From Swiss-Prot:
Recorded family membership: Belongs to the RNA methyltransferase RlmH family.
InterPro entries: Alpha/beta_knot_MTases, RlmH-like, tRNA_m1G_MTases_N
Gene3D superfamilies per UniProt: 3.40.1280.10
Entries under HAMAP family matching the protein: 23SrRNA_methyltr_H (MF_00658)
Annotated compartments: Cytoplasm
Keyword Cell membrane recorded: no
Gene that this sequence comes from: rlmH
Name of the protein: Ribosomal RNA large subunit methyltransferase H
EC number(s) on file: 2.1.1.177
Taxonomic placement: Bacteria, Bacillati, Cyanobacteriota, Cyanophyceae, Synechococcales
Catalytic activities: pseudouridine(1915) in 23S rRNA + S-adenosyl-L-methionine = N(3)-methylpseudouridine(1915) in 23S rRNA + S-adenosyl-L-homocysteine + H(+)
Binding annotation for S-adenosyl-L-methionine: 86, 105-110
Record keyword Transport present: no
Length: 138
């Protein structure tokens, strides 16, 4: 079963749109252990360890449906799963090359703030799927 304390989101910049912030806060109430850090730059040295997985969000990444994403996250066993979200300029190629996975949320393009909200919802959904919660309906 997935635990929300295994996840951290590192994102460049602050959320400016109040309705996105409100949505994120709703999921934070459901998963208070989820770590969300707003940064100016990424430092992979701080995140890289034997017990950390680094997943970069990028439009050219691999796409999964919700069940597949849950299964993937379960396969990481007891490792800490760190998601990196860039700003409007995306994430540099060297960070992508040093990540464990490049993930795309959709073939559609989203503003980076909205991508943050969608990712948090998908983490919540994966946690719910893994615990057989009625939140996800196939």
């Amino acid at each position: 079963m997935l635990q929300s304390n295994r996840f951290a989101i590192y994102a460049i910049g602050k959320i400016k749109k109040h309705w996105i912030r409100d949505g994120i806060n709703q999921y934070k109430k459901r998963m208070p252990e989820l770590i969300i850090n707003e940064l100016k730059t990424f430092n992979l040295n701080n995140l890289r360890s034997n017990n950390n997985i680094i997943i970069v969000l990028s439009e050219e990444g691999k796409q999964f449906n919700s069940i597949e994403l849950c299964s993937l996250l379960l396969n990481f066993k007891n490792k800490k799963i760190n998601f990196l979200i860039g700003d409007t300029d995306g994430i540099s190629s060297d960070i992508k090359e040093n990540s464990d996975l490049i993930l795309s949320l959709s073939p559609l393009t989203f503003p980076h703030e909205l991508a943050r909200l969608i990712l948090i919802e998908q983490i919540y959904r994966a946690v719910s799927i893994s615990s057989n919660s009625p939140y996800h309906r196939s």
